[in-house]
Amino acid sequence: MPNLDLSRYGITDVEEIVHNPSYDLLFEEETRDDLQGYEKGTVTDLGAVAVDTGIFTGRSPKDKYIVRDDTTRDTVWWADQGKNDNKPLSTETWNELKGLVTEQLSHKRLFVVDTYCGANEDTRLAVRFITEVAWQAHFVKNMFIRPSEEELENFEPDFVVMNGAKCINPKWQEQELNSENFVAFNLTEKIQLIGGTWYGGEMKKGMFSMMNYFLPLKGIASMHCSANVGQEGDVAVFFGLSGTGKTTLSTDPKRALIGDDEHGWDDDGVFNFEGGCYAKTINLSKEAEPDIYNAIRRDALLENVAVDDNGVVDFDDNSKTENTRVSYPIYHIDNIVKPVSKAGHAKKVIFLTADAFGVLPPVSKLTKEQAQYHFLSGFTAKLAGTERGVTEPTPTFSSCFGAAFLSLHPTQYAEVLVKRMEAAGAEAYLVNTGWNGTGKRISIKATRAIIDAILDGSIEDAEFVQLPHFNLAMPTELAGVEDSSILDPRKTYEDDGEWDVRAKDLAERFVANFEKFTDTDNGKALVAAGPQL
């Protein structure tokens, strides 16, 4: 029997423990008539329950802390050393925060959900979630790997997450913290604390940050990417920041989905960390994304969507947030890798970027050094929405296409990834799903044809030319791309000089961003693989 004595975590006099509740019980619990506020779920006409998370409709990166002690002092990439969210916390302040959460959870009826993070038995984390809110228990049951009955019998957690969303920290100013809310980690005690924020994603991304700490130290790549596998067993991984196409491009009727967001790569191959998907639902339609739409049914959990009095969901309504979401168990998608979300070694590594500057080609093949350079740069760009004319694009450089979730220095992830790629003989490509000189976004049809050419290997037969300034190898034509002129971004401009001006501007931004990596010999050597001014 698993040890359910919560007093070892500081939680006392518990009224009742609802341990590993079924989906049916969770449905009953989260829709009870006597619930109020953010605890109460609404049944929608799609069968899924919808909940609200209040003002917290996304993560709170400024409220993220890691205890700086003997375990972490020399390993964590601290916020005072780089642009990231790993703010140090003293053990003394940690103990005060822990006291707040354990006091909040004591004397209550609690939900305890035991899960795994990581599909590989050798390196997975056994994670126990403790919460007083039924839908939060539902969220982690969806998102993490659900152990078998046999595994649950002897379950002993490696890591514990205590979610005290209802409690806040009144001493935050005195403790020199960011606000009354907190998401804090102690890697010695192996505990995560959540206070003040109701956003479900804090539990998901919290454990991703922990996998990002433990795995690279063991030589295993930990990646913010989606992954799929073809009928011949050929694996592809898709790195990219939010909005670049990770979920859309990896959901392919010809290929089985391994996972849509978080993966590891070890001696056996690529494996999912999760047991579910957390998909954006803004402007979702059955026609454009049938797989995701059809996954929204009983046992799925909608967040911050608009629901009318009849339970009808309006996916186009962004009045609460643009970041409307749904979590569902991965088996709600038909074409997935079964029974375990893992496959062999990746042969194709695809970096997705949405370049709003109109400079980068739709696809370029990268050398080993360029792959490291662009992985460390993690570039994408956003366009502020205007009705006509191109506004100033905003560049985003997020190391490893996921700086917010990195616990170690970015170069450690790059080194591990490159070793895995070399051992597998994997090729790397930079795919731009953004804009070109026409002012329009590259069509999803053209991007899918490019992805097909990468995955079936036909891109290797193409003739390549070099793009100036960036020294990227671009194919001159590809099967399925009807207008091959789009493959060279220069040809999409009426005035050749305009591309050149934009390219120099973007190149300068790349160079300035990469300066922070030139404090190591490896980083200095990679400068030559980036844009040249």
Curated annotation (Swiss-Prot):
Report the gene name: pckA
Q: In which pathway does it act?
A: Carbohydrate biosynthesis; gluconeogenesis
Give me the comment on cofactor binding. Answer: Binds 1 Mn(2+) ion per subunit.
Cofactor section:
Mn(2+)
EC number of this enzyme: 4.1.1.49
Tell me which residues bind substrate.
R59, Y199, K205, R325
Q: What does this protein do?
A: Involved in the gluconeogenesis. Catalyzes the conversion of oxaloacetate (OAA) to phosphoenolpyruvate (PEP) through direct phosphoryl transfer between the nucleoside triphosphate and OAA.
Q: What is this protein called?
A: Phosphoenolpyruvate carboxykinase (ATP)
- Tell me which residues bind ATP: 205, 224, 240-248, 289, 325, 441-442, 447
Q: Which InterPro entries match?
A: PEP_carboxykinase_ATP, PEP_carboxykinase_C, PEP_carboxykinase_N, PEPCK_ATP_CS
Q: Which GO terms describe its cellular component?
A: cytosol
Molecular function GO labels: ATP binding; metal ion binding; phosphoenolpyruvate carboxykinase (ATP) activity
Q: Which organism is it from?
A: Idiomarina loihiensis (strain ATCC BAA-735 / DSM 15497 / L2-TR)
HAMAP family to which the protein is assigned, alphabetical: PEPCK_ATP
Source species taxonomy:
Bacteria, Pseudomonadati, Pseudomonadota, Gammaproteobacteria, Alteromonadales
Residues bound to Mn(2+): K205, H224, D261
Which catalytic reaction applies to this protein?
Answer: oxaloacetate + ATP = phosphoenolpyruvate + ADP + CO2
* Localization of this protein: Cytoplasm
Per UniProt, the keywords (alphabetical) are: ATP-binding, Cytoplasm, Decarboxylase, Gluconeogenesis, Lyase, Manganese, Metal-binding, Nucleotide-binding
Q: How does it assemble?
A: Monomer.
What family is this protein classified in? Belongs to the phosphoenolpyruvate carboxykinase (ATP) family.
- What biological processes does GO assign it? gluconeogenesis
